[in-house]
Regions:
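A structural microfeature
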Residues: 2, 48-51
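N-terminal strand-loop-strand
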Residues: 1-16
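Positively charged, solvent-exposed patches that mediate nucleic-acid binding
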Residues: 66, 80, 103
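Charged phosphate-binding loop/patch that engages nucleotide di/tri-phosphates or the phosphate backbone
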Residues: 100-116
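Short, charged/polar surface micro-motifs in flexible loops or helix N-caps
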Residues: 8-10, 23-24, 70-74
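The catalytic Nudix box helix
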Residues: 17-49, 88
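Active-site-adjacent beta-strand/loop module that shapes the phosphate/pyrophosphate-binding cleft
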Residues: 43-44, 52-76, 85, 108
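C-terminal structural segments of small proteins and small subunits
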Residues: 74, 89-103
Length: 116
């Protein structure tokens, strides 16, 4: 699932993997489940760890940690993104991804190739 950042947001128009910030006392999977509920209105069971990336965005250092969603319930809602789209990992390469997400997609695709 890719989510397009809204017009008033940082990196507006770029596509990203949904998620958000880890709050104090949360694990990464707990934070992702909470953020998916807040942003998309779904209840997600978080699966396997995919990888991590750091990206310098101006003065900010962005640290991303990607996890698979094993399953979810509920209907997707566009609460803070301008669009949502289901794509294969290969199709995702054709979208204008936020720069910090690009290495995570490449890592996921490489890992899938190794497991086949």
């Amino acid at each position: 699932l890719l989510a397009q950042r809204g017009a008033g947001s940082d990196q507006a128009g770029l596509w990203e993997f949904p998620g958000g910030k880890v709050e104090a006392g949360e694990s990464q999977p707990e934070a992702l489940a909470r953020e998916l509920d807040e942003e998309l209105g779904i209840c997600a069971r978080i699966g396997n760890y995919v990888g991590s990336n750091q990206w310098q965005q101006g003065e900010r250092l962005i640290r991303l940690h990607a996890w698979q969603v094993a399953e979810f319930s509920g209907e997707l809602q566009q609460r803070c993104h301008s669009a949502l789209v289901w794509v294969t990992p290969q199709q995702a390469q054709e979208y204008a991804l936020a720069p910090a997400d690009v290495p995570l997609l490449a890592e996921y695709i490489a890992a899938q190739g190794d497991s086949r």
